A protein has these predicted regions:
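A structural signal for short, well-ordered beta-strand segments and their strand-loop junctions
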Residues: 100, 111-112, 159, 208-212, ...
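C-terminus-biased signal that marks the final domain/tail of proteins
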Residues: 1-95, 189-200, 206, 214-218, ...
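Short acidic-glycine loop/turn motifs at beta-strand connectors
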Residues: 101-108, 152-154, 212-216, 223-227, ...
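Structured soluble/peripheral alpha/beta segments that form catalytic or ligand/cofactor-binding pockets
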Residues: 143-148, 168, 191-200, 204-230
Length: 334
């Protein structure tokens, strides 16, 4: 896999961060500008929908509208067009994620790891964002403003995997996963704060979300449009792939991907075998599927685009661009 990844550091107030993102987009992917700013023409219903989405942002994702407005100003388009064209584009992913709690880590700290699988048609952009009044964070971007995952400067880790992937995306009023992930990174310091934020958050998506904090707490939040299950953990490990496993949500899906079950069982088997280290978690990420999490099936939306690791005590984030079983794709520290 030969692709170019981008790392951006964005600092300043939300509007200036939005403008900087627009400049980066215009420079790196000028063909993508039209995705965000396609005009509505005479379709007044889309304008009204954009206005409604901005109002939802104001309530549930405070501060995000200012970023969108700066982005729109720089591109010379309307904020309503930007929010409509990002919120209505379906995105998902075939991912694996695990958090090891201090009693099961040889370091006595909280260790996190995840891989993200999709096709080669992706943003491939890691961002560090520092906006006054919010937690600074580093994570992979989706549609500029959203996040697939990340670690903030308060020691909170967030990662996601799509759940119930064979079900059609619901048409209920709500956000895609990336808005929830970004808002947790911006606003939360602990697992309990993340659960409190996520519980009422309107979601038009089927999601497995794992959060962990530097105090040795973690939780798996399985969330759909009309139900949510939460499993808290302070010992052992917690993990997820692409299906629901908790009471209250696991009956949601009537069909499951075999590769999701295979990866879920593999992680559990290897994690139970012994206490974990950053190196042992890296081995999970860098061993080829099915006896590992590194995948190369890009034409089937199942190729590893990146892997992340973090030790929440020292706040280090390690990213591998591309599948981790390729020797040239080393982990870099951010």
């Amino acid at each position: 896999m030969k692709h170019t990844y981008t790392y951006q550091v964005l600092e300043g107030d939300a509007r200036s961060v939005g403008r900087a993102q627009a400049r980066h987009l215009r420079e790196l992917s000028p063909e993508a500008v039209q995705i965000y700013g396609s005009p509505f023409g005479n379709k007044t219903e889309r304008l009204k929908e954009g206005e409604r989405l901005l109002a939802m942002n104001e309530r549930w994702c405070p501060g995000l509208n200012e970023e969108i407005e700066g982005f729109a100003e720089e591109l010379g388009v309307s904020p309503e067009a930007v929010i409509y064209n990002t919120a209505t584009i379906p995105r998902t992913g075939n991912c694996s994620q695990i958090v090891v709690l201090p009693d099961h880590a040889t370091t006595g700290t909280t260790l996190c790891a995840r891989s993200y699988e999709w096709s080669k048609d992706d943003e491939l952009t890691l961002k560090t964002v520092r906006i006054p009044g919010r937690a600074a964070h580093t994570g992979f971007a989706v549609l500029c403003f959203g996040r697939f995952d990340g670690l903030n400067d308060r020691g909170l880790w967030v990662s996601i995997s799509a759940a119930n992937p064979l079900a059609p995306l619901p048409e209920t009023e709500g956000f895609r996963f990336w808005a929830l992930t970004r808002t947790i990174l911006d606003r939360c310091s602990s697992v309990e704060e993340a659960i409190e934020l996520a519980t009422p958050f309107p979601l038009a998506f089927h999601l497995n979300l794992i959060v962990a904090d530097k105090n040795g707490n973690a939780a798996l939040i399985e969330k759909g449009p009309d139900r949510q299950s939460v499993q808290r953990a302070t010992s052992g490990f917690i993990h997820a792939t692409n299906h629901y496993t908790l009471e209250g949500t696991r009956d949601y899906a009537t069909e499951l991907f075999v590769h999701s079950l295979t990866r879920h069982e593999y992680i559990a088997r290897e994690a139970k075998r012994e206490t974990q280290t950053m190196d042992s978690l890296r081995k999970l990420l860098s061993s080829p599927f099915p006896e590992g999490l590194a995948c190369h099936y890009y034409n089937d939306w199942f190729g590893t685009l990146w892997s992340l690791q973090a030790d929440l005590t020292d706040g280090t984030l390690h990213a591998c661009f591309g599948p981790a079983d390729v020797p040239e794709n080393r982990f870099r520290t951010f």
